[in-house]
Curated annotation (Swiss-Prot):
This is Tyrosine recombinase XerC. It is found in: Cytoplasm. It comes from Rickettsia felis (strain ATCC VR-1525 / URRWXCal2). The gene is xerC. Residues 4-95 form the Core-binding (CB) domain. Forms a cyclic heterotetrameric complex composed of two molecules of XerC and two molecules of XerD. The keyword Ribosomal protein does not apply.
Length: 305
């Protein structure tokens, strides 16, 4: 429960993030959830309905208590950092639009993130997944949708959000897909015939009519398919076939990059295909590839036995 004036500020802030800062819909939603979590904690902390004055006078002890609460609630370091960034962003917005100046929150540093290397699947696990994902749909068009989507992600290295944004217009180019990724950065990815053919087969039996600009991957009720729904299909697959715990839609993007690297692709090309802003992000895949080689060496090299 929020004070009306605060809710109005939040609504204006969300429009600012969307229209002026060009944040993705996913980021706006995440930031909004983080801010509401902060305000709910402030409600509890002050034992009364939060007002704009509470927000302006929030002290460092309250903010640190909120961060500690998120840590106790098993939020990841990344989620805690994002939450603090969201609240700082809101306070910056208040500086622009109200009389708030130099709030103490800007002196608080985000917790250091643990750098996790991307986890790829083995090529065998990818093959098993692609061969059997059709078994989890109960309806023919859903089964074909699942396979087309998974093949597209692995064949093109797309993020799940990017894959779910594919429209009929993307299919009109016979050679390339134009993708708008993070930060509204455009990249061009070659169409693999197997992915395009599966999508075409899926669209032929899809029971819903779509306009050229509508996302082609649909849920059972005809609405745009959401990432959690597809990941639930992958959970069923993972459990039945005893596949790795880290198998998610995103792990197929990691696998795309790792397998290209293992088969001789250069880092710059992989960077372009993934849409990474920095080469250092792509270089993480060299570390996972080295770990893969070490594992092979340890288990298979004759002199070690």
């Amino acid at each position: 429960m929020l004070d009306t004036s605060i809710q109005e500020l939040i609504d204006k802030w969300q429009k600012y993030l969307d229209l002026q800062r060009n944040y993705s819909n996913h980021t706006v939603i995440s930031y909004n959830n983080d801010l509401k979590h902060f305000l709910e904690f402030m409600n509890y902390y002050n034992s009364e309905l939060v007002t704009i004055n509470h927000i302006k006078t929030a002290d460092i002890r309250l903010i640190r208590s909120w961060l500690a609460k998120r840590n106790c609630d098993n939020f990841t370091t990344s989620s805690i950092s994002r939450g603090l960034s969201a609240v700082k962003n809101f306070y910056r917005f208040l500086e622009k639009t109200t009389q708030l100046n130099s709030h103490i929150i800007f002196s608080i540093k985000s917790p250091k993130k643990t750098k996790l290397l991307p986890k790829a699947l083995s090529e065998d696990d990818v093959v098993i997944s692609l061969e059997h994902i059709e078994e989890y749909g109960n309806v023919k068009w859903v089964e074909l949708r699942n396979k087309a989507l998974l093949v597209l992600i692995y064949a093109s290295g797309l993020r799940i959000s990017e894959a779910l944004s594919i429209t009929k217009l993307h299919l009109q180019n016979l050679e390339f897909i134009r993708i708008i990724g993070k930060g509204s950065k455009e990249r061009i990815i070659p169409w693999l015939p197997i992915a395009k053919n599966l999508i075409t087969q899926y669209l032929e039996i899809l029971p819903y009519k779509l306009g050229d600009n509508e996302p082609i991957f649909r849920g059972k009720q005809g609405k745009k398919l959401q990432p959690p729904v597809f990941n639930r299909e992958l959970i069923k697959l993972k459990h039945f076939y005893g596949l790795p715990q880290h198998l998610t839609a995103h792990s197929f993007r990691h696998s795309f990059a790792s397998h290209l690297l293992e088969h001789g692709a250069d880092l710059r090309s992989i960077q372009e295909l993934l849409g990474h802003k920095s080469l250092s992000t792509t270089q993480n895949y060299t570390k996972t590839s080295i770990k893969h080689l070490e594992a092979v060496y340890t288990t298979a090299y004759p002199i070690k036995k």
